[in-house]
Amino acid sequence: HGSGPLPADGPPVRVIANALLKHGVAVLCYDKRGVGASGGTFRHNAYDDFVEDGINAVHYLNSRNDVDHKAIGLLGSSEGSIIAPEIALRSKSVAFVIHRAGIAVDAIECNLWEQRHEQIDRGISGDLLEDSIRLQQLIFEMLVESKKDPKTVESESWHQVDAEIVSFNQKYRSNETWIKHGKRFGNKLADWERFFEGVASAIAYDPQPFIEQLDIPMLYIFAEKDENVPTSASVKYLKSLKMNSSKQLDIRIIPDV
């Protein structure tokens, strides 16, 4: 699945599933937790939930006698792509992974890429664009660090980011483009803490340790001009990994889309 409360029979999933079925490939699609026929509660960006559900789906396939247990693969799109390597590694019984709109960089980099293009689409550019992205990166990185080490809260580094927020707000408080189209950073890091509680596992997520431990074929399919996924950064990492290891990586880029 991509991000959001998506059902098993949504248009993107249905198209891919039907294509695989026509080639004789059995497909298991499931509603996200808390969506459709699935139990539980859906939580945005709950990667820990999504990983556990994916592992359970693999275990279910392994319990069936009509499935070739040596040929079980994963196909993840966007958000599904970033967690697929962890599912494959922890389930210990996945033969291959296909990544559609693949993500091979950490979630902070992916979020910043998406926010950059959202702001460009709203007419934000130049120093205002660069300053806002830089500040968002500082906020994300400090909040992630604070979850790893609570002592970071109210540290000198924490207050430096607070000062950056104040400086940005003062610099652009009269900027009409930002007032109309920009996002609000609040007045201090503490204003972000409640929001961050709900997305901490997603913002701090990094698929690379799992990718690097996998020893199975992986296909990454990218759109050259994807505004949600940083194609160039992901491809650069994957090519370097392939060059310096024996990884079975196939990288495909669809041009001009």
Model features per residue range: what roles?
Residues 242-257:
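Catalytic histidine neighborhood in serine/cysteine hydrolases
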Residues 66-78:
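Alpha/beta-hydrolase fold nucleophile elbow
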Residues 8-27:
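Short amphipathic alpha-helix adjacent to the substrate-entry channel of hydrolases
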Residues 44-65:
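Alpha/beta-hydrolase active-site loop
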Residues 81-92:
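Short glycine-enriched nucleophile-adjacent loop
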Residues 214, 220-222, 226:
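Short beta-strand/loop motif that positions the catalytic acidic residue
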Residues 227-233:
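Conserved alpha/beta-hydrolase "acid-adjacent" motif
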Residues 100-210:
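Accessory cap/linker subdomain of secreted extracellular hydrolases
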